[in-house]
């Protein structure tokens, strides 16, 4: 079922420095709201900077959907304090608005007048907006206001080049890409534990449901909020932020070149469904960038993605093709409403341990049968993860074990890895986080989803959301900066606006020509 990795852990205990230098990055999305909880109708504030060119603060789908982006760092405290500084600066510029603390928005009706994010009159700016118009026409606008946390993670080069299993690989690029694909396949197999532990969207507005309430036995509270008693992360369900079945695209993460080829095919292959939408409206305005299965790489919504930093003018696929996988992006984290910045240190420590474990254990190639079973496991945890004696498939013979049984096996290894990481930093942080989180297995009421549901049922989503939003706002505007200061942040605002103007001046091609050349 799960490989015994005691020998691998013993090797790491002898070579603990192999795990020194883990780099991370965090992206946090949050909706700007009015004081009454309704969506903000204002454009992205000029005083925060240009959403096109600001290094750390931008927008996602809509004008009111903020996205905070930290630089990469091997220091967790630096990352969290940097993210806090970005929130504090933003709060100081939107004094009459608040930042919504949940992944799922509060919707008082289905006509929320969502303004798609605008990035100016440059070709790249128009392209970003047109892509979002395409998302609206393909999947709807409300669904795209669901927010999350993206956690970027990379293991040290020293680990990949010295780990005993990698000694015979031909070159560093191949072995690193192969290693990350192994990690990704195992994340699909066992990553359901992340929404079990940290899922924070057990309830959803009725406007998101459409016909799905017929399929699942949802209950409803007084606010017209639908919930399932054992659910963990409806954001990750087919109700929420999921648009493409990677099985249909034949993207299996088994081989690097096959992954690139399958991804490219999805970007080039027309979709009958999207052809029916049309490329332009009657006035000649674009309704989407193209009618292919994916408009651009970002449209592939998966639980985890291989990534590489891009150079100017380079696409993600080109970067991957040219230089291999550099890190993985974890996309299955809900916003943690119990943290002002949407994520806490314990979550990061636990994710580190789990992702290292995914890199260590044996990772057989996945076929379609395997993938269907892993998908069923994710679905079970998403909809009924806290159900007593919940079962998980462990092989393609339909054999099952309880979530607790599998979870205990995983945590046994995580505790061993925690010892190694703590030995590098001379503290007990990883062990403490591991032991505290392990309690969630036998005590599902400790999970974030259970705590969220309790608040939503007793206090309501609007009242709870506004209470937390106001509490965090006061905390942000009264907090001193940690790593950044007011001057640095104000200078970045000025620089971002100047850079946006430069980009607009440098455009030569018409937008049509620009799109054709992409």
UniProtKB/Swiss-Prot annotation:
Its EC number is 6.3.2.2. Keywords: ATP-binding, Glutathione biosynthesis, Ligase, Nucleotide-binding. One of its GO terms (molecular function) is ATP binding. It is an enzyme of class 6 (ligase). InterPro entries: Gln_synth/guanido_kin_cat_dom (IPR014746), Glu_cys_ligase (IPR007370), Glut_cys_ligase (IPR006334). It catalyses: L-cysteine + L-glutamate + ATP = gamma-L-glutamyl-L-cysteine + ADP + phosphate + H(+). One of its GO terms (biological process) is glutathione biosynthetic process. Pathway: Sulfur metabolism; glutathione biosynthesis; glutathione from L-cysteine and L-glutamate: step 1/2. SUPFAM superfamilies: Glutamine synthetase/guanido kinase. It holds the Pfam family Glu_cys_ligase. One of its GO terms (cellular component) is cytosol. Belongs to the glutamate--cysteine ligase type 1 family. Type 1 subfamily. This is Glutamate--cysteine ligase. It comes from Buchnera aphidicola subsp. Acyrthosiphon pisum (strain Tuc7). The lineage of its organism: Bacteria, Pseudomonadati, Pseudomonadota, Gammaproteobacteria, Enterobacterales.
